[in-house]
Amino acid sequence: MRLSRFFLPILKETPKEAEIVSHRLMLRAGMIRQEAAGIYAWLPLGLRVLKKIEAIVREEQNRAGAIELLMPTLQLADLWRESGRYDAYGPEMLRIQDRHKRELLYGPTNEEMITEIFRGYIRSYKSLPLNLYHIQWKFRDEQRPRFGVMRGREFLMKDAYSFDIDEAGARRSYNRMFVAYLRTFARMGLKAIPMRAETGPIGGDLSHEFIVLAETGESGVYIDKDVLDLPIPGTEVDYDGDLTPIVRQWTTAYAATEDVHDGPRYEREVPEERRVHTRGIEVGQIFYFGTKYSESMKALVTGTDGVEQPIHGGSYGVGVSRLVGAIIEACHDEAGIKWPEAVAPFTVAILNLKQGASDTDEACERIYRELSARGVDVLYDDTDQRAGAKFATADLIGSPWQVMVGPKGLAEGKVEIKRRGDGSRENVALEDAVARLMA
């Protein structure tokens, strides 16, 4: 993509309403625009990141055996009355009437609807286990939306729902999602730590939040620092095998949010030199809620004994749009964003330091064509901005690699390559630049 043809409305001044780093940088880098309190338009740069995060989430859900569908944003209020949550959910739920006076709501979550879909088709234990997921926009009418996409009213979520004949099967499904989440966040360059958590309005008796450590996080957390060195399961992980050892390894070391923190146990089990008290950002949460919804909504299947019984369920959420902010909180410096390569809007930024000069134009075009032909996402700054402005833009939007092409370097047959993550630089021969970036 040529920057001269791309829509990138960069702001020179930081908007006053931006309280945290991710909100400031997303506004300044032209990733989002606020349309109402807690509601944002996703501009091209931000949308590219959002789509890459969504793709990783989808790949890992599919790998773990979940099956994608798509549920509507609007739901019937009667479904929520069946489960008993319509009145209990509170003012965060946006309630709507259509022209026929039917009561609807803009779904804040989907346990009721997925249970209704399940009970409409599944009758026997032979169809289980089953895990269905979707990626959809949701709305919760936060009393005080703040922190940009970190605590907005409209947000993109991945929700998965598992259905099993008994508790043992449901816990196996829970473990699959637990491991899938470890892999999902690691692929995005994040170390997300699973922590025992409250179940809240979802219900049930088992839940883990996946927390990314960040000073601006909304949750206080207490951890044994040994958890930071635990290995992430590789691509060879067998989701049909016994995942209990992996889950046990990650849940044995102490890690808890403030809501469930056990001070005496923490001091008893964790040596003082390994205690870490900091803050974190929740990027996902998983729940086992047993028969909470299947009993109230009559989602029954015939078991091996021929008797109808309620299924055991779980739900598994990932905040897809929230992850954009969380990654920025974890990956930035004073100049701007430092995207992990897997989610960067553009992997390589080419900076033409003397636009209009035949030698720099030709060199930039050559690198641009060769990288694009190899499927690399490239942003070529072919504008007539001064070099300093181009450097500032490149650092702000955070492409992992920058290629600086100027007349002084080309006189020696070289271009400069900068790694945004650590700031390291190297001069390479023009003919070797593409190979170096592809290495």
From Swiss-Prot:
Q: Which GO terms describe its cellular component?
A: cytosol
Localisation per UniProt entry = Cytoplasm
Keyword list (alphabetical) reads:
Aminoacyl-tRNA synthetase, ATP-binding, Cytoplasm, Ligase, Nucleotide-binding, Protein biosynthesis
**SUPFAM superfamilies for this protein:** Class II aaRS ABD-related, Class II aaRS and biotin synthetases
Q: Please name the GO terms that the record assigns under molecular function.
A: ATP binding; proline-tRNA ligase activity
Return the broad EC class.
ligase
Which Enzyme Commission number(s) are on file for it? 6.1.1.15
Quaternary data: Homodimer.
Q: What is this protein called?
A: Proline--tRNA ligase
